[in-house]
Amino acid sequence: MTPDPAADAAPRLDVRGLRVVLPDGRVVIEDLTLAVAPGEVVVLLGGSGAGKSTFSRVLFERDELDRAGFDVVAAQVALDHGELGLVPQRGALFDHLDVRGNLELAMRYADAPDDPARWLERVGLDPALAAPGTPVSGLSGGQAQRVAVARVLASRRRLLFLDEPSVGLDPQRVRRLARLIREQVRALGLSAIVVTHDVALAAGVADRLFLLSLEHRRLEQLFAAEWPGPMEDRADTERGHWMLRLAEALISHLDEHGDRVAPRTAHRPPLRPWRVLEPLGRPFRVAGTALALAPRQLVRRTRDFATVAARVLAQTFLRPLPFYAIVSVLIGYTVLYVISKVGGAGVRPDALIRQIGGAYVVALAPALAAVLFVAASGSATNAWLGSMGLTRQTLALDALGVDSRAYLWAPAWVACGLAFIAVAALFALGMIAGGLLVCRQYHVPHAWELLTADLLDPRPERVRYALRAGFLVWIYAWGIASDVVAKGGAPKPEADAVTRGMTASVVACTLWVVAWELATVLVVL
């Protein structure tokens, strides 16, 4: 079939009349229009607060903007999201995968299997970095940025959005990055939008230069009739001349308008009072989403499911395992020892122990395990998911066509729930072990059978207590998992949001435990 020349000439991105109003009524973008042609590199410059990040969110996080109360209106946004790729600040490499895994994930979801080493070589990196086990944490800033470029290229995206790609790079690496962008655009027929403050990068790559004006809140083309094109292949004198002119234009604009506050519209976005209650329902929506997506992800993407689940199991069970073992034994010993002393004079401790049996384990293990699990294990997973959002790894997943709900939420939810069930069982065993020490101290015979009877073979009048304990373990497991994933996976605009999410989850899950303890006690008693 012969390609349609008209289709090839159509803009990769065509935005007309874009207007974005913040929830407080400030107009951050007004009548923005931009078309990016095939093979073209467009650079967007602007000061802080000019709307560069907001424009990025319109392209990649439109639904999140709507949920946050932004008013986003455009006459036209023509864009094939299947062709749009993102290179976030500092690369946003997936830290739970090695270098090879980052590239393989992109290729799997693009249904384009290939050798990761080839893509590393294409961006000027040592192919040896594709060896299994090479951690992304060991890469320099320049290497990480190049791996991020290789990852998006391997996903076969045709329109690249590079968000401040030169942050943290020295001038030499900025020059290399500019050369890399131009080389890949030419070699693969790509288009690119580069958002930057770096005039060296801007001059090196731009076919056209735009300023997001703090005065008019729209794009204004710089040097429209004069700009000779990307400076990367130009003589140093010409390059230096245009870099100075570009820097002067940007500084002049910032000097005049840098402190300008965004204007407010007379018509604020409509109030949505139900948004206040949205966080309360989020854990239940996460549970429903995870239940729906987990079976499909497990069957179709077994490797990805196992990778994320293994990470969460390590955080929630394997690493804190010694802590749970020690604490449960100490609590088991302390509780039974105190019980043995409450009878007072004339009451033999061993008689009290035989009377209480393992009831203390049945009554206390679910709640104690839950509270400790939330504070230790739940906080670890909450922090990891939060850091994924904060460092834009979650956004990078979605930009590669990887549904972060299926890839992250579903396996994390399953692994967190199963980890709590395992921790609750371990906690019960630890409390029994502590009780065995007390029984040994008082020479209580058949101590194992005595302390485990209420769990393994309870008397008829105590069956309901064992059933209550089993029910609580089950309800705590999935309630905690839902809240941890919901709060960890919520948007994280700044670092403090990660710690707030952790604290909120501890509070919410503790209230969840207390409520179920009280409710079930009333039913059982």
Language model segments and positions:
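Catalytic Walker B motif of ABC-type/P-loop ATPase nucleotide-binding domains
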Residues: 160-163
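H-loop/switch region of ABC-family ATPase nucleotide-binding domains
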Residues: 196-197
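Conserved ABC ATPase signature
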Residues: 135-139, 143
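Hydrophobic anchor residue at the start of the ABC signature
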Residues: 149
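Q-loop/switch helix immediately C-terminal to the Walker
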Residues: 90, 97-111
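Conserved beta-strand-loop-alpha-helix hinge in the C-terminal portion
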Residues: 215-251
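Conserved ABC ATPase "signature" region
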Residues: 113-130
